């Protein structure tokens, strides 16, 4: 009987730990100070978007002369745009402008992250892009965790194209493969 109580206590302890610290498992952000200076071999503009709830989203925006459109790149769940900016080169060399944002809690972006806020932030920037580009000139590119965000934003709009790089079928399904023994559906706060 004592083994059963001990086993149940360990199980409940794991579930509680996972629930309260799940962000440590899913996100590996690199935080940057506001005065950090990005360095890339091609010209860019740094943008800051102040969100209605007090959060702020930091982005980098590369432009080319006579652009064919813009690639809106939604990165994965690690580091910051400091290390992801290298992906701009391929698109710039093919005549596309390139915009990439950091999610809340990554890089210079600030605020509490949630699934709803990530989607709303990404949608806000998409709408900002439509002030300069018609939707048939916007390409949404989602990589890894960002593929879920890109797919959602694409479903709300009509971009020219949606590109998914190393996507996943279901965030819940991917996590459930490893911790199938937990009531995961009720434990996850972020299920992009």
What residue ranges belong to the model's regions?
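An N-terminal hydrophobic leader/cap segment in hydrolases
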Residues: 3-50
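Short, flexible hinge/linker loops that cap or flank conserved catalytic cores
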Residues: 40-41, 64-66, 132
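Short gly/ser/thr-rich secondary-structure transition/capping motifs
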Residues: 51-56, 188-192
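Alpha/beta-hydrolase fold nucleophile elbow
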Residues: 133-144
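Hydrolase active-site cap/lid region
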Residues: 148-192
